[in-house]
Amino acid sequence: MKVLVAMDEFNGIISSYQANRYVEEAVASQIEHADIVQVPLFNGRHELMDSVFLWQSGNKYRVKAHDADMNDVEAMYGQTDSGMTVIEGNLFLNGEKPIDQRSSYGLGEVLKAALDNQAKHIVISLGGIGSFDAGAGMLQALGAKFYDDEANIVDVSEGAYKIKYIRRIDLSDVHPQLANAKLQLMSDFSSRLYGKQSEIMQTYQTFQLNQSEAAEIDNLVWYFSELFKSELKLAIGPIAVSYTHLRAHETGRN
């Protein structure tokens, strides 16, 4: 008999992989010679790297980076033998500072390390990360420069609140391999980039923010998006992120 086991995580209790193992042991104890296949699930927040490497071989790399509060941390990314690079943001991009003082700079550091290692196909799990700076810090770590109206450098690693001072964006020194890489972003939350359905506007109470404070952050994200479109002459349509469960082995398909 063939048995497929694909258990979701029990949030905060056991992982998808652990749940699968328990079910596998139970089935094996009751059905002799059962052909049992485990399929771990991940949801854009937890277990992405573990799930992928359960199905594929490859290497994991430790790199020095920063958390959302710009504290030194050790982060990790993985590269499979099939050429997929996995970055699980919530494993290192956490913070305790006020939301508008957190940065995604550390994500850029890990992404840079992966690009230095010839990464071509990069999957980034964004669920559970601690920053809401529209990726400004990440871009700075990758070489982007931001200037105010007096041509002074704006250091967005200090947090999202610095976005309001940006008047010009210079991407001339961004990592040269970024343009050649295929990026896939995963999230555990259905949201818009900004507006009433943005993640911060839907979850601000969990961060002990009031609606007005959340709206300030949301407006910064909107401003950064508009600045990009204006400065770089880009036409960007509405950006939405949807929640989905994926099987680990499917992410390795071309």
Feature annotation, model-predicted:
Residues E24, A34, S157-A160:
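Non-transmembrane, aqueous-exposed alpha-helical and coiled segments at domain scale
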Residues Y105, E109-K112, A119-S125, G130-A181:
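Glycine/threonine-rich beta-strand-loop-alpha-helix active-site module
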Residues E9-S16, D100, A119-L139, P238-S242:
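Glycine/serine-rich anion-binding loops at beta->alpha junctions
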Residues A26-G95, L183-S191:
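Glycine-rich nucleotide/cofactor/substrate-binding loop typically near the N-terminus or early
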Residues H245-A248, G252-N254:
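Single conserved hydrophobic/aromatic residue that forms the stacking wall/gate
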Residues D72-S131:
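Anion-binding (especially nucleotide phosphate/pyrophosphate-binding) glycine-rich loop
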Residues I99, L183-Y243:
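Carboxylate- and glycine-rich phosphate/diphosphate-binding segment that chelates Mg2+/Mn2+
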Residues M1-V3:
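Extreme N-terminal starter segment of soluble prokaryotic enzymes
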